[in-house]
C-alpha cells in the first residue's frame, strides 16, 4: 500500500513577495476561483499556475498575461515550490533509497524541477480528478456533547 500525504500546494496557491523581497507560496489560495482570479485566466492575482505557465512548463490560459512577471519572482517561486515538494518527499521516505513519486490533484502541475532522492515522478492521466475522489471517499467524523444536570436529570 503506498503512503499518501496531502500537501497544501495547489494550482491556486497565491504567490507573493514579502517586505524583505522573499517570494512566498501559499498557504492562502484562490481555491475554486482559480479560473477567474489567476493572471492566465484574466484575473489580477499571481498564483502557482501562473508561475508554471510563466516558466514555460505548462500551457494553460493566456500565456501572454504572465510575460510581465519578473524573472526573480518566477525563479523564487519555483525554488519555494521545489522546497515544499522536497520536504514532503523527505518526510515520507523510510530510508535513504531513491523513490518513485506519484503526484495527483490540482497541484500536481507544480512539479517543475528535479527532486533529490526521487528517481521518477509520475503524473497520471486524470491526475486532477484525485481531489474529487479524495473528497468522495473521506471519512466523516463528528462529536456530540450531551449535558445532564445531576439534580434534575436528562433534558433532551
Task: Label the model's feature ranges.
Residues 1-156:
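Helical "lid/coupling" subdomains associated with nucleotide-phosphate turnover
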Amino acid at each position: 500500500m503506498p503512503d499518501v500525504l496531502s500537501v497544501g500546494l495547489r494550482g491556486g496557491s497565491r504567490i507573493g513577495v514579502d517586505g524583505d523581497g522573499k517570494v512566498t507560496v501559499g498557504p492562502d489560495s484562490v481555491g475554486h476561483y482559480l479560473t477567474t482570479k489567476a493572471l492566465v485566466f484574466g484575473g489580477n492575482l499571481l498564483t502557482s499556475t501562473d508561475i508554471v505557465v510563466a516558466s514555460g512548463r505548462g500551457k494553460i490560459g493566456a500565456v501572454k498575461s504572465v510575460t510581465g512577471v519578473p524573472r526573480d519572482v518566477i525563479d523564487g517561486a519555483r525554488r519555494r515550490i521545489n522546497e515544499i515538494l522536497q520536504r514532503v518527499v523527505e518526510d515520507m521516505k523510510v530510508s535513504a533509497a531513491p523513490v518513485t513519486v506519484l503526484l495527483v490533484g490540482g497541484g500536481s502541475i507544480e512539479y517543475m524541477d528535479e527532486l533529490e532522492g526521487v528517481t521518477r515522478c509520475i503524473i497520471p492521466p486524470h491526475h486532477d480528478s484525485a481531489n474529487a475522489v479524495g473528497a468522495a471517499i473521506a471519512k466523516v467524523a463528528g462529536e456530540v456533547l450531551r449535558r445532564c444536570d445531576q439534580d434534575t436529570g436528562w433534558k433532551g
